[in-house]
Every structure is written in structure tokens, then in C-alpha cells.
Amino acid sequence: MHDLLETVAGAGVDGGQTPPAEAWSARAWFAGGERIGYAPRSRAIVASEDAPLRIFLRREGDPAQAVSFLPGFPDGSFGWAKVLSYLPNATDMPKLFLDYVGMGDSDKPKDYAYSTSERADLVEAIWPELGVQSTTLVAFDFSSLVVLELLRRRLERSERGEPAGGPDIRGVFIFNGGLFTDGHTHPWYTTPMLRRLPNWARRGVGRPFALFKRTPGVRKLWSEGYQVTDAELRELHSAMDRHDGLFYLAAAAGFMADHKAQGDRLDFCHIYKAYRDQFPFLVGGSDEDPFEHRQVDLARERLGKFGLRIERLPGGHLTTNERPEALAALIAKFERGTTIRPS
């Protein structure tokens, strides 16, 4: 299995090879990583044997200059599996992937306060532990809010006269993510409904697989023209169901409400203008994304005149699954240009 993963990662964009289908399985993806200890109260990575929780981490190459790939909802780090197959190899582009608490191969406690803030805490704990000195932030879906939280914290620390903390940031790449509180367009029967489920009902979400694959909200992840297969749906289900984790669909579905509650603090216009002269930004979206399709239009309307780079790709919300090669090409091109600062 390790040889298979090495071959796939090594092919990359330059290799021009189509990876074998088994490289895109949840089992292969998680076999290529590790579970490390995490103490949320102290916001620190700790020895695994003493850890209250264990989180999934996958590294490709030297972490000192790694690109930080932050996961989307609901597929977690596994969502990057196809994209990785088309990215430059680990030497040309070191990479760091992770699952937040509750996602993928990380532990999934039922009595945990899931939020944007605790996700940012985890990212900030991982960076120094791995010796990350410089990074490009690549965020998909709700990790856009984690990026906004991380950048806002640095501004707040600076205002208090404290060190910004964390690695130097080379650039910020956000795709199909929420940026503006008035731009969320999630259909009512998806996250808005899920977040209102009582705790007792959350454990039955997504079960059995036969019900999961017929759930309207799940089908909405892909464009109407994309013929998602049972095999793809089963791999998604497998990644989400690890460690009895399907309840996370409802437990973490409050991220939009979280965003709206902190709308002023996580205002993308202010954050972008504060950093635009320090490193480049790219905001992208899919043509048929039903969840965040207004975000790109609002970004262009509000920040296009200030130099924000905006890109679109065809397809539905799960660009990582539906258009992995095109998304990988955008990411690789952006990372190559991160040494060029906006004028």
C-alpha cells in the first residue's frame, strides 16, 4: 500500500499519469497518514499515549515549507485524495493534510464543542509541532472560515503588541468556501436542517448506506451532469463513518451560524485589505455550487477593484472529486506565484 501511495504522489502534475482507482479509496488515503495526540484544552500536540484525543495527519515532503491543505465539509481530508494525484510531487510541493476533530480518521467525541475556533486551534497547534516555517493556506468549503479566523487572530495579536505567531504565510487559496455572511446559499434541507437535529437524532444520520446515497443533500454535492457512482458514494460514506462519525454531519453543521455570529470580526473585506500587500489571495468557485455560489460574485463585486484574484471552474460543489485535475492545476499555478507580491 505504501508503494502505491508513493507512486501516485510521485506522478503529480508533471507525471501526467492517471492514478489507479484504488489510490482514491478512503482506506489507501488514511493508510498514508498517522494519528497523533492532541489536547484541546491546552491547544497542544501531545504524546499519543497521554492524549485525550487523536487526530489524523498526513505529510508529503519537508513540512518546513509545506502547503497546508485544510479540509472541506463533510468529506474531510479524504476530499483531497484525487487532487493530490495531480499535484506536483512532494519535493516540488511539500504538503500537509489534516482532519479536524470529528472528521475522517480523527477521533469523534460526541460531547465536543465543534466550532470554527476549535478548528483553528488545532491548525495552530500542528504548525509548530511539525516545524512549519512558511506555508500557503489552501482551504476548501468551510475551512475558508478557519482561514479567516487564523488571519483575524494575527491581526488581534498585532494590535495587542504580541507576536503574530505561526509560520510566515505565502498566500491564501480558497475554493467553494464561505466569505461573506450574506452569501451563504445552503438549501434548507442540508446544513440548516441538520444543525437543528436534537442530539438523540444525530447518531442515526447517514445510516444505512442505502439511505445515505439517496439523501437529497448528499446528491447536491455534485453537479446535475456528473454521474456519481455507487463506488464514489461508498468511499465518501466510509471516510465519514470512521470511528462512528456520521453524527458529525449534524454536530458540525452550525458553521454558517457561527460565521454570522462573528460577521464583523471575520469580515473578509477587512481581512483581505489588511493582508493584500503581504501575500496574494485567490478565491474560486464552481459554476453549479448550490451551497456557496454567491460568494464568488460578491467577492468580485466588493474586492475585484482591489486586486483580488477570482477563478471559476465548471461542475458542482465537490470540485475536489468532480474536477480534481483542474483544481490541482489552479493550486499548483498559485503556489508557484506566491513569491510574487501584489503591487
Predicted regions and their residues:
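Catalytic active-site module of serine/aspartate enzymes centered on a nucleophile-bearing elbow/loop
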Residues: 304-343
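Conserved acidic functional residues
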Residues: 72, 141, 321
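Glycine-centered tight beta-turn/hairpin loop motif at sheet-sheet or coil-to-beta transitions
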Residues: 48-54
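Conserved HGGG/HGGXW glycine-rich cap/lid loop of the alpha/beta-hydrolase fold
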Residues: 56-105
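Flexible "cap/lid" subdomain of the alpha/beta-hydrolase fold that forms the substrate-access gate
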Residues: 2-44, 55-59, 78-79, 96, ...
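Solvent-exposed amphipathic alpha-helical surface segments
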Residues: 90, 130, 157, 334-342
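Short, well-ordered alpha-helices that flank and scaffold nucleotide-derived cofactor binding pockets
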Residues: 82-89, 152-156, 298, 329, ...
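Short hydrophobic "strand-cap" motifs at the C-terminus of beta-strands
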Residues: 70, 284, 315-316
